[in-house]
Each structure stands twice: as C-alpha cells, then as structure tokens.
Amino acid sequence: MIVGIIDADTHIDETDATWEYMAGGDSSYKPTTAYPSNPDPKLPPARYWVIDGKRQIRFIRSDKDSGTTVETRELLDVKKRLKHMDELGTDTQVIYPTLFLMEATEKPEINAAMRRSYNRWLGDRCGQSGGRLRWVCMPPLQNMDESLAEIRWSKDHGACGILKKGDREAGKYPADPYFEPLYAEAEKLDLPICIHTGSGVPDFSPAREFSHGQFMRTKGAAINGVLGLILHRVPAKFPKLRFGCIEAGSMWAPFVAYDLRRQQLRQQGRESTSVLGVPLIEVPVNVFEENRIYITCQVDEDLPYIIKTVGENNLMVGSDYTHRDPSMELEFRKELQARADKADIPRSAVQKILYDNPKVFYGL
C-alpha cells in the first residue's frame, strides 16, 4: 500500500504578483505584459513578458488542456491548489518555475532582482500551505556571494532544492569549479541540486523557431549537465550532496551509462590523453546510485529496462502540473499502479518512485 505521494516536478505560472517584491532600485526592472499589436486570428491568443525591452512568452493556458485553473497555476488561491491535490491523491508538490526555465535576460542585475522577488513570492505563497507545497529556489548565479545568501534565505522559508541548468549559467557549465562554493553550501544546508530541463543561455529568437533547437535547450542540456558532473567527479567532492535530473525522462540513463563505460574503456592503455580533455574515471556498476543522482521518469517508459540500469532507489516521477506538454502526467499514480498490477514492474518500485525516493532526494 502506498503511504503517500510526493509529486517531484510541478510548476507555477509567474504572475504580476511575482514581481511585487522588487522594491527600491529593483522596481525599475519589473517585467511587464504585452500583447501582439496585430494578432493573427488563425493562431491561439498570445501574450509576452517584456524584460529589459525583450519579449519572453507568457503562456495563456487552457483549463481543459492543462487540467488546472488560473487560480491553481498562478497560486492565486493556495487552498484551491491544495484541494486539487487532494482530488489527485497527492500529499506534497515540489514547485519549479516557468519563465526561468529559459534564461530571460543577459544582465546580472536584472536577473538577481527578478530571482529575489520570485523566491520571496513563492516562499510566501507556499508558506500558506501547511508544508504541502515545497519549492525549488532560484539563486542569482552571476554573483556567488548573493547566491549563497539567497539559498540560505530560501532554506529558512521552505525551499527544498536549488534549480540549476545543465548548460552554461554565468558562462560556466555545472562541473566548473566556479560553482563549488554553491555546491558546498548546498551540501551544508541539505539542499539538492535540481538540474531541470531548460537553458541558462539567453535566446531571444522568435517562439516559432523554438522547435529547431528544442532538444538541445531542454532535455539535452539537462542530460549533458549530469554527464559533466559525473565525468569531473563533482559528486565525489561533495559526498553528501544529491543531484537530480528533472523532466528529461529516464530513457537516456542506460545510454549515458553505456557511453561512459565505452568512452573510458577506449581511453585505457593509450600513450597520451585525449586532446579533448576527457578525464579518466572509474565507472561503477550503478553510476547513478553511486553518485546520488535521482531521475524523474515517465510512467510509459521502458521501466523494467531502466530499473536494471538506474535501480529502484533513484527514480522519481512528476506530473508537470500547470504545464501542457508531453511531460504532463496528472494521473501518474494510477498508471504506475496499473503496471505493477500487471507485474510489469515490482510493487516495491512503485512505492519508492511515488514517495520514498523523492522524500530522500528533497530531504522532506
């Protein structure tokens, strides 16, 4: 019997209230909302956040398609979100952003002001939930001292993780020594590093061009970030720190484990090291469990195969609540239990994926 359900990946849509914590000099950086001057009646309605004169999508979502309402998506009514969680059978949701999944500005001062306001807004809203809404904080990574102060504040106000992108942030990849002070403080605070799909590199291309680089800027970035951490032994440097790959599915994990082994095997016995600077490492039997890397899976993936590589102890699942894309799975509990009923996956794995593993990963 499942003792509880922790939804390891949900979202909010930022709203005007998100920026109300930008005071003093920060207030001049507040995002504003704009609409197309000549909307195409053949296309869905659109609107944008305007940040430093540049546009970023501000989604207009369908309640029917997303299975949510504006009150629950934007946390306008925390009680309504909790009521919906009750209907879904969810005890706890862990919340990630929407706008910040793609870096929205090139300017550190604007980035810091927006992230501080977001953290305070979300900390305030989740603080009204009796501990059922937990959240992942957004440090302003271009300034490490500010980042450390921000994650300390966030930990004190209900945050249970730190959002990190798998490609460059502050011009650096996740395994760069620049981030070691962040990882050291996260380890001390017992906050995991949550590598969510998305990109830390600003891109102001039109939305219609997003599909041309979609994988590289979303799932591909997250997977590459995890691989870099393993290759450069970052988990070994911080032996109590947990890392997560969020919303990229889990089918990639067997390939990454295979590719690591093949890469390392081909380097052994060479007279010189690779000009590409690929480090030599020992690859354990379960590279993910050994490195405390947790992965959110999709309930229709080849889970028996994935469990052989990742194990039962490092998989989680999220509904992608608020968003309407291929990752959305509001009924993940029923689907996992149905697979266990057919003996497709072990019942023990269902309990771990739904509750035990996210509880450990997020330190709940």
Briefly describe each language-model feature range.
Residues 127-134, 139, 145, 151-316:
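Catalytic pocket-lining loop regions of alpha/beta-barrel enzymes
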Residues 18-34, 109-114, 147, 179, ...:
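Aromatic- and acidic-residue-enriched segments that line the glycan-binding/catalytic groove
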Residues 62-73, 83-108, 132-140, 160-164:
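Divalent metal-dependent hydrolysis catalytic cores, especially in the metallo-beta-lactamase
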Residues 5-7, 13, 92-96, 194-196, ...:
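A structural signal for short, well-ordered beta-strand segments and their strand-loop junctions
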Residues 98, 141, 197-201, 321-324:
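Short glycine-enriched loops at secondary-structure junctions
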Residues 2-5, 15-72, 76-92, 120-128, ...:
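Mid-to-C-terminal alpha-helical segments outside catalytic/metal-binding sites
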Residues 71-79, 114-116, 120, 172-183:
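Aromatic- and glycine-enriched glycan-recognition loops and surfaces
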Residues 10, 320-321:
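Active-site metal-binding loops of divalent metal-dependent hydrolases
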